[in-house]
Amino acid sequence: MNPLVSIILTSYNKPNSVGKAIESVINQLYTHWELFIMDDNSNTETVQTIMKYLKNPKIHYFNSHIEESERYKTTRYATLINKAIPKTKGKYICYLTDDNIYLPNRLKTMVHLLERRKDVDIVYSEQLVKILSNNRKKINQIVRKTQGIQYKAAGRVDHCSVMHTRKIVNEVYKKYGGYWNDDPQFWINGDAAFWKRLNEFKPFYPIPQILDVTWKFPESFQRLYTNVPKTIPNGTLVRGLSNEIFVIDQQTRRRISKKMLGTLNYYEERVVKIPDPFLFKYEEGEPVDEEIFTYPEKIPNQRLIKGKNSPNIYYLQNHKKYRIKNLHVFKQYHFKQNDIVILDEEIVAKIPESNQIIDLLTNTGATLPDGTLFKCYSNYYLSYHNRLHPIQKDVINRLNLSVQQAVNMPTSILSHYSKGEPFKWVKKSMYVK
């Protein structure tokens, strides 16, 4: 009798592709399988797509109902896999994601090798990677080739390209008290951490043919993760996989409507798409809504404001208004007239006043506007709390900031400001030590 294969599909908010992933299992030439769809509390559209397939008795569905505020605390797909493995009954186990499909001969080919070679516990195949644009058009593709027998598979093999025995995963559990390591440090390479565990017992044997296809959408975690700094600067507009927009204000995320974006002269093209775990690690603050005109302390920081009948222009930071001394200073910091928010005089009057923002070159240690990008030779800095935080150029571009708008700062002035923690992206090594 053909052995049972257990497939674990992890799903989160990909209604346009999760159905294709499920159908790729249904269309397998090898028919003795069970599919566990582990959904991470996806949106309604995704869940409705999944529900269409649940009449099939071989398909099982579980929803995590995870709270958004808890989402960042573990590597969610690893957590879901750990919950699924004890539910499975197959002799062999493999994995699938909602942006990946199996080719029809995938299970048949892998089972054949594992059944023929009793000394082999893990097999892996080649994978076709299709990189897609926002309108789902292919802009590039590559093939991840097999590279012989892998004694160190971490970072070299995608988890949708693997099948392993139940026997070896039980060995992992005996040693570690669990299966996949779902520590949040492994968001980008959870499979690599698990492969390291598997490699302690057995190597990965290659099947040198393409057996699965993965799509790299603009909203794929790996693409959204790239060049996002560990700390997102205050004043940044962000969104996750949903269409809701937030402004990072004093390291909280504040929901803001498209109407209020226009009212406060934010620009939607400046919104930075980030992975949901990065978004939800920021506590949600008060929404940016009409109440800001009643309670001006709720106006987001890093806005230019002025009263309707006053010539004075102010910059908001730390919930105080800093008067910009004159037009020369306004231009020196590359402020723009179109960014000024016109408010009733009584609202402006209620905001506490602090120092002036004066000529950068005439007063060492002068108050710097928060969130201003500075350049000194080839180095870039963002200012916060009168400290200069180094920032990588790739991070600048990722945050939709403009290097062309950077304010030049002479070395003689730079030396008068202390340095803060850098805004940098540290690429997680795909090789787990």
Report the location of each language-model feature.
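N-proximal low-complexity "stem/linker" segments adjacent to membrane-targeting elements
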Residues: 1-26
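Acidic donor-binding segment of Leloir-type glycosyltransferases
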Residues: 22-69
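Active-site acidic Asp-centered loop
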Residues: 40, 96-98
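Glycine-rich, basic loop-to-helix element that forms the pyrophosphate-binding segment
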Residues: 66-88
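Short aromatic/hydrophobic "clamp" motif used to bind/position activated sugar donors
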Residues: 93
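Conserved donor NDP-sugar-binding/catalytic core segment of glycosyltransferases
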Residues: 101, 105-138
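Conserved nucleotide-sugar donor-binding catalytic segment
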Residues: 125, 146-227
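Short, surface-exposed polybasic-aromatic patches that bind anionic ligands, especially phosphate groups
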Residues: 228-433
